[in-house]
Amino acid sequence: MTIDKNKDPMGAAILEAVTSRQGDRRPRGHKHHEPLRVLSPMFEDDELPVSHLLRTPDEMPEIERKALDISYGKILDVGAGARCHSLALQEMGHEVTAIDISPLCCEAMERRGIKDVRHVDLFDKSLSGKFNTILLLMNGTGIAGRLSRLPSLLGRLKEIMADDGQVLIDSSDIKYVYGDEDDLASIIPEGKYYGEVEFQMVYKDIRGKQFEWLYVDFALLETIAKSCGMKCEMILEGAQHDYLARLTL
């Protein structure tokens, strides 16, 4: 799986910001760029500042800083995007492989100086080897898309994780968004998990395809991980119903 360059708003926004920033003498984060628009049939339209995707460790939330602090060994950064986490880890002296399905994001990462960038899907069998730390941050469970596909995601992570390895993954329990239980029952169709969401990104005149994204509460992640033969540990709870979890064998 790969993303068409002409339908990749996030990749276009990141590459434009990185290219512009390389010729800008002002400190990082000080140059204004048009934000990414985030559309969803389930929520109000939102905006994501491009600078957020290029943030430094000091600008990261506690959950992300904690994940960087406890990363070790050979590291795989999945869905790397800009990728602020890969760059921070590389600057800390770690060996990092950054992967993304967006060719524009991969170009941006190379421009930022990340040494090992691969334009490849996590599920592509050409991605082989064993990693000590696998990072899936900025709602890492989202990659699964739907709850029914979460076991497949965890199974793939097991294949490429070293015996002494760890998966560091974050997500959020978004039940609070829907109000009380009665509101939730009236909004979410029967048989559908409330954390299954559809999004679409827009940057300037570039409109991406609608995609599925999954938020998972910790108790459910723990249950599914156990069914896949993995241990699931809560590392840190955030202030916005979010959390960082560690999966091990």
Region spans (language model):
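N-terminal auxiliary segments of SAM/dcSAM-dependent transferases
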Residues: 1-37
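SAM-dependent methyltransferase
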Residues: 4-5, 12-21, 163-226
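Conserved alpha-helix/loop element of class I SAM-dependent methyltransferases that forms part
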Residues: 54-74
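Conserved SAM-binding loop of SAM-dependent methyltransferases across substrates and taxa
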Residues: 82-93
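Conserved SAM/SAH-binding beta-strand->alpha-helix loop
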Residues: 102-103
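Conserved SAM-binding strand-loop segment of SAM-dependent methyltransferases
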Residues: 113-124
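A short SAM/SAH-binding and catalytic strip from SAM-dependent methyltransferases
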Residues: 131-151
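A short glycine-rich, Lys/Arg-flanked "PGG" loop and its adjoining helix->strand segment in the class I
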Residues: 150-163
